[in-house]
A protein has these predicted regions:
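Noncatalytic, solvent-exposed loop/strand surfaces
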Residues: 1-334
Length: 334
């Protein structure tokens, strides 16, 4: 774990969570630290898959750690190939929630953020997946939403009880669920399904084919990157550089454009700020598209290093992690 001053980039502290031989193999595009750390402002949690889950305070003091077992995560149709984990932990109302989908024995677990003790653990009849769970703060209740090959599911985050499920997903699921005020968006890009589902909150039971699905698209879901809701539009970036914009409420296609990249594709997710959408490519180019119903490519910025991680936006800064460099990008001071 590394901590930096956001304003200056000065290193503040560094902690080694695990030392030893890795317990599993990994994909060539992955690392053993692919998951994103999470914090609620009091506890900082980092997840390294089979190498464990580690909690610190904001000064880097170790608080607790948990071994969740060896996770066998890889291609469902070629189990000898292990790709490694990528799902990140989330914090919600004093709970650390981790989705652990693997070849056999998939589960989702909630731990006490102060002690690391198990609060609940729910088994999942699922193939390996790589998306991060998300809590949809609905008007009537909160729903813990997970992507998955057999079913997209909603759980009660307090108990782990399944509330609803939706079939029809891809056999490989990587994007993270996202939401607006009343709609939940879950996508995946493995064909032949490659769906985008827009789901109304508050569902119960099996909602496959029901009116709880506001709209859906087939063979339009992104393979790795998570879609983006910005304003009244839903954006999706395919790994080959096809960029789609839809009307979030009704599902109408606004545009479908190819980003003019060279070489490799796109793995990081699009992010947005101040009316612009930023699309990072694996080659290290960040394309800038104006948000809204008309496609307008505003620029292309070369970072000159491979870029696999999604940028983070905080306190007027865009934080970009390339292969060897951590960048903070800000508006020029007047």
């Amino acid at each position: 774990m590394l901590c930096f001053d956001l304003k200056t980039g000065k290193p503040l502290w560094e902690r080694t969570a695990y030392e030893g031989w890795p317990k599993e193999k990994r994909h060539v595009k992955s690392t053993y630290a692919s998951s994103t750390p999470a914090t609620d402002g009091r506890v900082l949690v980092a997840y390294f898959g089979s190498e464990g889950l580690y909690a610190y305070d904001l000064d880097g003091k170790p608080l607790w750690n948990r071994d969740l077992g060896r996770l066998d995560v890889g291609a469902y149709d070629a189990p000898e190939y292990e790709w490694g984990t990528a799902s990140s932990p989330i914090l919600y109302e004093g709970r650390v929630i981790v989705q652990c989908d693997q070849q056999k024995g998939s589960f989702i677990i909630a731990l006490d953020s102060k002690s690391g003790e198990t609060l609940w653990r729910t088994g999942r009849d699922e193939l390996p997946s790589w998306g991060t769970p998300a809590v949809f703060p609905g008007k009537a209740r909160a729903e813990l939403v997970t992507n998955g090959s057999n079913f997209i599911r909603g759980y009660d985050p307090a108990t782990g009880k399944e509330l609803w499920r939706l079939g029809g997903s891809s056999k490989i699921t990587t994007p993270t669920p996202i939401y607006s005020d009343s709609l939940i968006v879950v996508a995946s890009g493995r064909r032949p399904e490659a769906p985008i589902f827009v789901i109304r909150g508050g569902a119960s039971g099996d909602i496959t084919g029901s009116a709880q699905v506001a709209w859906q698209k087939q063979q339009r879901g992104p393979y790795i990157s998570t879609p983006l809701i910005y304003g009244k539009y839903l954006y999706a970036l395919g790994n080959a550089g096809i960029f789609d914009c839809y009307d979030l409420a009704g599902g109408g296609e606004i545009y479908r454009q190819r980003i003019p990249h060279q070489g490799s594709g796109f793995s990081a997710s699009p992010v947005a700020s101040d009316g612009y959408i930023y699309l990072p490519s694996e080659d290290g180019d960040i394309f800038v598209v104006k948000a809204g119903p008309a496609f307008e490519l505003m620029g292309q910025n070369a970072m000159d290093e491979p870029l696999m991680a999604t940028p983070a936006i905080a306190s007027g800064s865009m934080i970009v992690r390339t292969e060897h460099t951590l960048w903070a990008i800000r508006r020029r001071a007047n």
